[in-house]
């Protein structure tokens, strides 16, 4: 294993010594916070701001970062460079102050590119599955004692964090296509899990522009780099001839270089075989449910093969994978006055992701009534994929629909949850329930849940906090039961 001497890098590149303090506007996001954490471990002074406290903010504070709640121009005092997330508007006072003071302002992906510049980078892109695939790759490399640096968009449960500074040359990271900033990255291996219409405002509302951007992402690889792509995705299959780089394919497709077969699932695990060119087949036991996660695992296997990681390390990492926060995360049973229900939480916020969650839940618990509480994310996404959302959400037995999490967007008429409720009601005859705010969701769930139900909370907004509330409620119920037994 090749060790990285960070001090030597700074000596070799004197310009890096000029950067003393790095300020992050929107530091509480998983991607921004992850980069900040790695830089903190590299020895940089970190400051930042966000609109609210969260676990990422608290963790960074524990590492010595100075973090402000709320955005004010004075927050950037002392910064050598300012990093902004995609959620930051052009009129943000810290951004304006940095521009006025002529402090360099860079986007998240540009800073990630700097981290990747001196490392063997693996960049994972695609509309869906980025976080899980990146986590699986990081877990395999860790199991193989390669000690990678990683930056992931979700909490890797086994590490207790979404970012880590490793001491090897490997950097494994998500490549965010939402603002096309992933084009800043120059990795050695690029993964594309799938390509669907999303973030279309970035791409002029033109799917061809989105496809062209993914081709450019692959072509940013050096001529000796490798593209790892899913052959099951029809769009990717169409684009492969344009990549002009060594390409390894994976999937259930008969022609895939890393091919999945004999898939089966039992509750929260799955089993399948993986066939590889000029190598024996592997029998994989994956500690995740769903065919979509089998595809994510196949991508991770294909990447690991590029670095000659042994089959034992691959199999062991996948078998013992401890999961990711808010990715089909199971909280076990919780109790209401009407009985016990199983609670599962998921971050997916695109119709395809919601469909994958529903399919995995149905396969794991085929006899249970499926109750979903869903929070749409962004008005533009709801507008652009309205018909798909209406179709997918109508498949659950009982739907509770929270209003759209705006993520800084202005409301769009007809692209809201009340409209979705009406459409689903008219087309399916089902009765979705509109929920005015996440705060009232636990009480509403308590009124409609029956004994034996499966409850899915889903979305990329603040609905995740509801799960914590339900878990705390369950803990209090158990404490009261114990107290009554003692008396």
Swiss-Prot record:
EC number per UniProt: 6.3.2.8
Keyword Transcription on entry: no
GO CC field: cytoplasm
Gene Ontology MF term list: ATP binding; UDP-N-acetylmuramate-L-alanine ligase activity
Residues that bind ATP: 126-132
Pfam family, one: Mur_ligase_C
Signal peptide feature range: none
Main enzyme class: ligase
Keyword Cell division: yes
InterPro entries from the UniProt entry: Mur-like_cat_sf, Mur_ligase_C, Mur_ligase_C_dom_sf, Mur_ligase_cen, Mur_ligase_N, MurCDEF_pg_biosynth, UDP-N-AcMur_Ala_ligase_MurC
Catalyzed chemical reaction(s): UDP-N-acetyl-alpha-D-muramate + L-alanine + ATP = UDP-N-acetyl-alpha-D-muramoyl-L-alanine + ADP + phosphate + H(+)
Localization (cell): Cytoplasm
Example GO biological process: cell wall organization
Pathway named in the protein's UniProt entry: Cell wall biogenesis; peptidoglycan biosynthesis
Residue stretches in coiled coil: none
Keywords: ATP-binding, Cell cycle, Cell division, Cell shape, Cell wall biogenesis/degradation, Cytoplasm, Ligase, Nucleotide-binding, Peptidoglycan synthesis
Family: Belongs to the MurCDEF family.
NCBIfam families to which the protein is assigned, alphabetical: murC
Annotated function: Cell wall formation.
Name of protein: UDP-N-acetylmuramate--L-alanine ligase
Top-level taxonomy: Bacteria, Pseudomonadati, Pseudomonadota, Gammaproteobacteria, Alteromonadales
């Amino acid at each position: 294993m090749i060790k990285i001497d960070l001090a030597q890098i700074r000596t070799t590149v004197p310009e890096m010594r000029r950067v003393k303090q790095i300020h992050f506007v929107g530091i509480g996001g998983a991607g921004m916070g992850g980069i900040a954490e790695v830089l903190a471990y590299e020895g940089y002074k970190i400051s930042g701001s966000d609109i609210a406290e969260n676990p990422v903010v608290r963790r960074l504070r524990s590492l010595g970062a100075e973090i402000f709640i709320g955005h004010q121009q004075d927050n950037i005092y002392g910064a050598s460079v300012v990093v902004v997330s995609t959620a930051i508007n052009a009129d943000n006072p810290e951004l304006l102050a940095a521009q006025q003071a002529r402090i360099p302002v860079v986007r998240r992906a540009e800073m990630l590119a700097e981290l990747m510049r001196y490392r063997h980078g693996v960049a994972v892109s695609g509309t869906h599955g980025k976080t899980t695939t990146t986590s699986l790759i990081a877990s395999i490399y860790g199991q193989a004692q390669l000690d990678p640096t990683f930056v992931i968009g979700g909490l890797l449960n086994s590490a207790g964090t979404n970012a880590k500074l490793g001491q090897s040359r490997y950097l494994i990271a998500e490549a965010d296509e939402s603002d096309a900033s992933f084009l800043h990255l120059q990795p050695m291996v690029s993964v594309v899990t799938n390509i669907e219409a999303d973030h279309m405002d970035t791409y002029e509302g033109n799917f061809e522009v989105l496809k062209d951007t993914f081709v450019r992402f692959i072509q940013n690889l050096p001529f000796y780099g490798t593209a790892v792509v899913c052959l099951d995705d029809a769009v990717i299959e169409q684009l492969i001839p344009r990549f002009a780089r060594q390409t390894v394919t994976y999937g259930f497709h008969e022609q895939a270089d890393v091919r999945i077969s004999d898939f089966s699932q039992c509750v929260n695990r799955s089993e399948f075989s993986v066939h590889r060119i000029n190598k024996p087949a592997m029998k994989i036991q994956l500690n995740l449910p769903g065919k979509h996660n089998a595809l994510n695992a196949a991508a991770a296997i294909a990447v690991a093969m590029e670095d000659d990681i042994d089959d034992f390390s691959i199999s062991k990492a996948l078998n013992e994978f401890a999961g990711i926060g808010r990715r089909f995360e199971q909280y076990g049973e919780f109790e209401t006055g009407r009985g016990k229900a199983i609670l599962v939480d998921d971050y997916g916020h695109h119709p395809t992701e919601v469909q994958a969650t529903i399919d995995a839940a149905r396969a794991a618990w085929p006899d249970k009534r499926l109750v979903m509480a869903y929070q749409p994310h962004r008005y533009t996404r709801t507008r652009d994929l309205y018909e798909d959302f209406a179709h997918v959400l109508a498949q659950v037995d009982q739907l509770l629909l929270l209003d759209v999490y705006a993520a800084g967007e202005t409301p769009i008429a007809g692209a809201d949850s009340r409209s979705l409720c009406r459409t689903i009601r008219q087309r399916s005859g089902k009765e979705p329930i509109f929920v005015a705010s996440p705060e009232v969701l636990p009480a509403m769930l308590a009124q409609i849940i029956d004994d034996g139900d499966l409850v899915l909370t889903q979305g990329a907004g603040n609905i995740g906090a509801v799960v914590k509330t339900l878990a705390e409620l369950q803990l209090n119920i158990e404490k009261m039961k114990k107290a009554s037994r003692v008396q």
